[in-house]
């Protein structure tokens, strides 16, 4: 539970924090006691998220300046490095919890998908996750600190989905990236895990036609869409020492969809 304050001494960097799952993760980690560096391509949205966060180490819901918002396009190498530098300059330490949640979709059938739409989705979802993971790991190793890196993939990365060749490929890549990072970084005390959300109620899924939502919901054994908070619960667990012997895992949060 949040009242345990499992992350009282942690600094958490969350990308894609401006809405949906990223925002819910930021709120949950703050409720667990972490100081949160909320990053989004939309800097104003990141600021809005920070306003929702309570004071780290307390159950007070009023912001006390213990969190900070950042703007960055994580698909660009210099921007990702600069983000980590800015976070360290602001908090005087590297983040010990890093959650890569920044992601986009540009759906189209394989026969008609443009190279531009393929490249952009791969750049944000996969390359961006790589760049943030690399920069955060470098900062942690340099400081001698332990950490938990949590990359948000998707159940689609495991099973594929019609009209999402680019998205499915990017999220499958996130799983492979995270497992490899876990093998390489374990000796430094850095755990790396991925989370695979299923059909979650977010601004991204709200754009889907109702008949499509109904069709997918009917395939979920638990009978309903998930909430962003369902994903945030798992991320909080993986960020904490309650999962201290877990690394390289891919945790599905899907209500049983596609199991």
Swiss-Prot record:
The modification N6-succinyllysine is found at residues 158, 171. SUPFAM superfamilies: NAD(P)-binding Rossmann-fold domains. The modification N6-acetyllysine is found at residue 66. One of its GO terms (biological process) is estrogen biosynthetic process. NAD(+) binds at residues 13-21, 40-41, 72-74, 167-171, 200-202. Substrate binds at residue 154. Keywords: Acetylation, Fatty acid biosynthesis, Fatty acid metabolism, Lipid biosynthesis, Lipid metabolism, Mitochondrion, NAD, Oxidoreductase, Phosphoprotein, Steroid biosynthesis. Expressed in ovary at protein level. Pathway: Steroid biosynthesis; estrogen biosynthesis; Lipid metabolism; fatty acid biosynthesis; Lipid metabolism; mitochondrial fatty acid beta-oxidation. CDD domains: BKR_SDR_c (cd05333). The modification Phosphoserine is found at residue 58. Its main location: mitochondrion. Coiled coil: none annotated. Its EC number is 1.1.1.n12, 1.1.1.62, 1.1.1.239. Pfam families: adh_short_C2. It is an enzyme of class 1 (oxidoreductase). The keyword Cell division does not apply. It is found in: Mitochondrion matrix. The active site is at residue 167. One of its GO terms (molecular function) is NADH binding. Belongs to the short-chain dehydrogenases/reductases (SDR) family. NCBIfam families: PRK12826.1-2. Heterotetramer with CBR4; contains two molecules of HSD17B8 and CBR4. Required for the solubility and assembly of the heterotetramer 3-ketoacyl-[acyl carrier protein] (ACP) reductase functional complex (KAR or KAR1) that forms part of the mitochondrial fatty acid synthase (mtFAS). Alpha-subunit of the KAR complex that acts as scaffold protein required for the stability of carbonyl reductase type-4 (CBR4, beta-subunit of the KAR complex) and for its 3-ketoacyl-ACP reductase activity, thereby participating in mitochondrial fatty acid biosynthesis. This is (3R)-3-hydroxyacyl-CoA dehydrogenase. It comes from Rattus norvegicus. The gene is Hsd17b8.
